[in-house]
């Protein structure tokens, strides 16, 4: 193969890789600033990067939470927070092990573990069931919950 053709192919492959990485990054929410507060309790969320959760609305606006339990309080009862009727585009929580945003609807949550969040007992978010079950065994977690299994009664107080 001619060197010029090979260089063109390599360049195109690199551009495709960069574009796919940029598209993946574009799907993630913006990180909170030092002014963003939890939409439920009012805490400054940037102080707790390992616990941040966020809801992104279709208009591009976001609300942040200092942990999954406040995230679920808001998501399950939006009328309490004057959010009823707002159209949700994406839901994110911070994966406990990876400390990166993951899609909340595909994450698993461990209730009743010995790990505390910024405000005490917390639902611990993990990116998949296997990691959630391992975490529950290692940290005395009582129950592994899929996103749709979290109800107001299962949110720690």
Where would I find each of the regions flagged by the language model?
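Short hydrophobic/aromatic segments of transmembrane alpha-helices and their interfaces
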Residues: 7-8, 53-54, 114-115
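Bacterial N-terminal signal peptides
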Residues: 9-20
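N-terminal secretory signal peptides
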Residues: 26-84
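N-terminal secretory signal peptides that target proteins for export/translocation
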Residues: 1-6
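Thiol/selenol-based redox catalytic cores and closely related redox-interacting motifs
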Residues: 84-147, 153
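Sec/Tat signal peptide C-region and signal peptidase I cleavage site
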Residues: 21-25
